Regions:
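Mid-domain catalytic core of redox enzymes
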Residues: 206, 236-355
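Helical element adjacent to the flavin cofactor pocket in flavoenzyme catalytic cores
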Residues: 195-251
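A glycine-rich dinucleotide-binding beta-alpha-beta segment and adjacent secondary-structure elements
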Residues: 168-182, 334-340, 399-459
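N-terminal glycine-rich phosphate/pyrophosphate-binding loop and immediately adjacent elements
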Residues: 1-121, 430
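C-terminal segments that line or cap access tunnels to active or ligand-binding sites in enzymes
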Residues: 303-416
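Active-site-proximal substrate-binding core of FAD-dependent oxidoreductases
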Residues: 237-240, 478-483
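A conserved FAD-binding loop/helix module that cradles the flavin
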Residues: 36, 455-481
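Rossmann-like flavin
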Residues: 77-188
């Protein structure tokens, strides 16, 4: 947005390539997506590319996911149960009726209508707009439309509200998992997050070549309009003079003068002084107790059997709330975690699930507390966690052949090293409580010329949300210039 409007833009990135959390890890001879794996809200990217005089499809090849996600449970009373979710509501209702009965299918239809209503209320007033106060949000929605505002259900928890739609505990688990999309527990996250179901019904896409191609496309679009990118470039300090930004000092001592800086990192790095004492007032660091989920991940290359993998797969144990109590209260990892698997080469379930492969490239993920700055996991502990995760998958039918497996693990302390001052939190602040969405800072900081973007600021975590945050920062900068 800034480069296409004639501003001189330089992007300084401490990593060797663009993308941040949207990274790849080399395992053997393969590269595996190791960060966000779900591509939704395509309109956000279409709008960005359109405004820059280009088309998204000129830079990215996207395939509509035939199945949004495949879910399986190990619970003894439901051994071998499996449910696929599709973008079409009636197709899902039919699948849910077969899976859990007609009452649950009717509950699902009502749940979808509620999620769509919430999304329509908040899309343009909150998600795609500058951060409002609670009162400003009510103003945007309209005082004559307070009923719609009330139906966004910020005072209710997602877990409690799901109980009004679903009696089958497996469905409550499945839709409660949407809280983890913003790094939170369904027991404490607001029911407003029901809108995520509608986001997925609008479409999930698979990016040909892997999610890193999204970052590559954004770099190419920026360069097309004159933006310059410098990688392996560590900023030691954002320099301030007379209350406003004047530039940055790099790790090697080089000083670069800028009229403005957009900081696209976790706000805790500012608040803890990692970019210099003068900018600590720009944003308060997120307290450890308020951090979102971290994870232990394994990028795996191995032969699999026994389970028809789709691109997105979720394997559930039976006690979902125990998992979040362990992470958020006891600061540990349950022995029977929910396991997410992104099978990167399984793009079309109708074809791929029946193909015998020599090897699958997979991201395997379990939730963990964001304590990577105060504790670390030993190799023995990581191996035990891997075995626990593999047991859950095995009991759901998926066998990973250890004799063919190569893997690279990343625990919370690894994520903290990649994203300093986070403790390994992957989504900024946990979205717990009715006011959590207003606790994130907006595009402006407490320092003139310093703007904020990324998953720890408004409108929140996720690839499309982080993209929106960058556009809001550019918008605010231009507005501050009086344009």
């Amino acid at each position: 947005d800034l480069a296409r409007q004639g501003f001189d833009v330089e992007v300084l990135e401490r990593a060797s390539s663009p993308g941040g959390k949207m990274r790849e890890v080399k395992v053997g001879e393969s590269y595996i997506d190791a960060g966000p794996t779900v591509f939704t809200m395509k309109w956000v990217f279409e709008s960005l590319f359109h405004d820059a005089g280009s088309k998204l499809e000129e830079f990215l090849e996207l395939q509509t996911a035939s199945i949004l996600a495949r879910h399986a449970w190990r619970n003894d009373s439901h051994a071998g149960s499996r449910l696929d979710l599709f973008a079409d509501i009636e197709q899902n209702a039919a699948a849910i009726a077969d899976f859990a009965g007609g009452r649950e299918a009717n509950g699902y239809r009502a749940f979808c209508k509620r999620g769509a209503d919430i999304y329509q209320t908040l899309r343009d007033t909150y998600m795609a707009a500058q951060r409002p106060s609670p009162f400003e949000l009510v103003q945007r929605v309209g005082f004559g439309n307070l009923g719609a505002m009330w139906r966004t259900a910020p005072m209710k928890t997602l877990w409690a509200e799901l109980g009004n739609y679903f009696h089958d505990p497996r469905l409550r688990q499945l839709f409660g998992r949407y809280a983890t999309y913003v790094g939170s527990s369904p027991q404490f996250a607001p029911a407003t997050l029901m809108l995520i179901a509608h986001v997925e019904q609008e479409g999930v896409w698979i990016v040909k070549g892997g999610m890193r191609r999204v970052a590559d496309a954004l770099q190419q679009l920026g360069e097309k309009h004159g933006a310059r990118f410098r990688f392996n470039t560590h900023v030691d300090e954002i320099q301030i003079a007379q209350g406003r930004v004047e530039g940055v000092r790099l790790a090697g001592g080089e000083i670069l003068a800028f009229d403005a800086v957009v900081f696209n990192g976790d706000i805790s790095a500012l608040g803890t002084g990692l970019l210099g004492a003068p900018v600590t007032k720009a944003a308060k660091p997120i307290a450890r107790k308020d951090r979102s989920l971290s994870a232990v991940t394994w990028c795996v290359s191995a032969k699999t059997r026994g389970f028809p993998l789709h691109h997105h797969n979720v394997f559930f144990a039976e006690d979902y709330l125990e998992e979040f109590d362990a992470v958020f209260r006891r600061r540990t990892i349950t022995s029977a975690p929910t396991v997410y698997v992104c099978a990167q080469d399984r793009a079309d379930a109708a074809v791929d699930q029946h193909i015998e492969r020599d090897s699958d490239r997979m991201l395997v993920l379990i939730n963990a507390p964001a304590d990577g700055d105060v504790s670390s996991l030993s190799e023995v502990q990581i191996a035990a966690l891997q075995e626990n995760a593999f047991v859950v998958m095995r009991q759901c039918g998926l066998e990973i052949d250890a004799s063919t497996m190569s893997s690279v693990a990343t625990p919370p302390e690894g994520f903290n090293a990649l994203f300093p001052a986070t403790g390994g939190a992957l989504y900024g602040r946990a979205n717990h409580g009715s006011m959590a969405s207003f606790a994130r800072p907006g595009a402006t900081s407490g320092i003139r010329g310093l703007y904020l973007a990324g998953g720890s600021v408004h409108p929140g975590a996720g690839i499309p949300m982080a993209t929106i945050s960058g556009r809001l920062a550019a918008q605010r900068f231009i507005a501050d210039l009086g344009f």
